[in-house]
Amino acid sequence: MVATNRCCVFALLFALLLVHSLTEAGKGKEILGKIKEKIIEAKDKMKAGWERLTSQSEYACPAIDKFCEDHCAAKKAVGKCDDFKCKCIKL
């Protein structure tokens, strides 16, 4: 009889542990979902900022000539940085 009661107690504890684990796993998914949303939001902001910067290459011209070249290539021209300004020369 004592062995049967121990089995019931262990089965009850195991069931409670299982329910608790499943509950915590659900909370973990919520937290991971929120983190994933924030990462996606940050990625979108960085991508939009990068596109804005490359579309206005004169802001990056003193630092990186490649921005000016890419900006002017989109306009089918040759780009050259001159005194903090990107100048596009049509061919």
Curated annotation (Swiss-Prot):
InterPro entries: Long_scorpion_toxin_alpha/beta. Belongs to the long chain scorpion toxin family. Class 2 subfamily. One of its GO terms (cellular component) is extracellular region. The keyword Signal applies. Residues 58-91 form the BetaSPN-type CS-alpha/beta domain. Almeida et al., 2013 suggested naming this protein TstKMK, where KMK represents the first three N-terminal residues of the mature chain. However, Batista et al., 2007 identified a mature chain that begins two residues upstream of KMK. Expressed by the venom gland. Residues 26-42 form a propeptide. Keywords: Antibiotic, Antimicrobial, Disulfide bond, Ion channel impairing toxin, Neurotoxin, Potassium channel impairing toxin, Secreted, Signal, Toxin, Voltage-gated potassium channel impairing toxin. It is found in: Secreted. Its main location: secreted. This is Potassium channel toxin TstKMK. The full peptide presents antibacterial and cytotoxic activities. The synthetic C-terminus (AA 33-76) inhibits voltage-gated potassium channels Kv1.1/KCNA1, Kv1.2/KCNA2, and Kv1.3/KCNA3. The keyword Signal applies. It comes from the Eukaryota. It holds the Pfam family Scorpion_toxin_alpha-beta. GO terms for molecular function: potassium channel regulator activity; toxin activity. The lineage of its organism: Eukaryota, Metazoa, Ecdysozoa, Arthropoda, Chelicerata. Disulfide bonds join C61-C81, C68-C86, C72-C88. PROSITE patterns: BSPN_CSAB (PS51862). One of its GO terms (biological process) is defense response to bacterium. Residues 1-25 form the signal peptide.
